């Protein structure tokens, strides 16, 4: 189902949601951190989704053990490097890794700006080692409030040339986008792209707000757009992309099952929607699974899957020249 003549991308992938269970175990031992299990087999149910979670917030608790072992900046650097290694193993040509430095720093009071620098270093070294092209998206974790998001924003701005875009993630219902208008004004002033988690836990009005008030060029998840025909028309006309994460939306109980997922309808409507993983380490999936298992189960035809793959590059926060070069590089292999 994957067209090997086209670049394979993953543009909605959380770096801090892709910490290997084995790495959690090793860092726990290295830093003498008490874990809920002492073997890989018994740890996995604590750090990966085994059965679907009742809601998004419950799903997010599965991420916590991964960041609890980030006891140093070296640990942050390691997981960033391993994220690129995992991308290479999955056959990805281009990946956009998003991360919340405040969330990564929280358990051990690491300096937030130091976490940003460590992630940049780890990703840069990973790209050199494995030949994957990557860009970084900074996440503000709305769940922790406006002041914490301001601290994350300042840390990103200190490394503005290494950050490609700003995102807002976390508790969408409890912390609406209207609380963060000034944050996104500064992000746009910095020349960054904007993508926002919206229409996952909240309804289509959250997507409208992300576009109109925060300046979103892409929407993370966006499943609730299906409830608003005018919004779907607008997304298609304005080429505002939807970063679909099929398995994730089932595991968070955002969508009942893959057959009910709106991605197929989005593509039929002419919306620029792509296939992505979200939190592969927590979900126990990879991009290959999303293309070969999840997408067919969601009713996508072979041609629709190919279109979603094309959309992944078209939606990417790359220049037209960078996209052309990547297409040519893959086609030449």
Curated annotation (Swiss-Prot):
Cellular component, GO annotation: cytosol
Cofactor note: Binds 1 zinc ion per subunit.
Coiled-coil ranges per UniProt: none
Cofactors demanded by this protein: Zn(2+)
Function, in words: Catalyzes the hydrolytic deamination of adenosine and 2-deoxyadenosine.
Residues involved in Zn(2+) binding: 12, 14, 197, 278
Lineage: Bacteria, Pseudomonadati, Pseudomonadota, Gammaproteobacteria, Enterobacterales
Binding site for substrate: 14, 16, 170, 279
Name this polypeptide is given: Adenosine deaminase
Originating organism: Escherichia coli O1:K1 / APEC
């Amino acid at each position: 189902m994957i067209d090997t003549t086209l670049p394979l991308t993953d543009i909605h992938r959380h770096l801090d949601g892709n910490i290997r269970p084995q790495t959690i175990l090793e860092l726990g031992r290295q830093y003498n951190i008490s874990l809920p299990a002492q073997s890989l087999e018994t740890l996995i149910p604590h750090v990966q989704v085994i059965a679907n979670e009742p809601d998004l917030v419950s799903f997010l608790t599965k991420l916590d053990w991964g960041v609890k072992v980030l006891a140093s900046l070296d640990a942050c650097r390691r997981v960033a490097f391993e994220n690129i290694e995992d991308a290479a193993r999955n056959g990805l040509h281009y990946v956009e890794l998003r991360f919340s430095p405040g969330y990564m720093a929280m358990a051990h009071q690491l300096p937030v700006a130091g976490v940003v620098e460590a992630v940049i270093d780890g990703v840069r070294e990973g790209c050199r080692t494995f030949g994957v092209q990557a860009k970084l998206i900074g996440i503000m974790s709305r769940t922790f409030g406006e002041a914490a998001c301001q601290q994350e924003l300042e840390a990103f701005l200190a490394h503005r040339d290494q950050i490609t875009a700003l995102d807002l993630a976390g508790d969408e219902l409890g912390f609406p986008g209207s609380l963060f208008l000034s944050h996104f004004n500064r992000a746009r002033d910095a020349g960054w792209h904007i993508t926002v988690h919206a229409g996952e836990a909240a309804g289509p009005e959250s997507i409208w707000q992300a576009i109109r008030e925060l300046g979103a060029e892409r929407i993370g998840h966006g499943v609730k757009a299906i409830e608003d025909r005018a919004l779907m028309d607008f997304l298609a006309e304005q080429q505002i992309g939807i970063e679909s994460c099929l398995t994730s939306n089932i595991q968070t109980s955002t969508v009942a099952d893959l057959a009910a997922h709106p991605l197929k309808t989005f593509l039929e409507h002419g919306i620029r929607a792509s296939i992505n993983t979200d939190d592969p380490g927590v979900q126990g999936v990879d991009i290959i699974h999303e293309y070969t298992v999840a997408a067919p189960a969601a009713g996508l035809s072979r041609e629709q899957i190919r279109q979603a793959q094309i959309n992944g590059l078209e939606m990417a926060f790359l220049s037209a020249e960078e996209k052309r070069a990547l297409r040519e590089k893959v086609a030449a292999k």
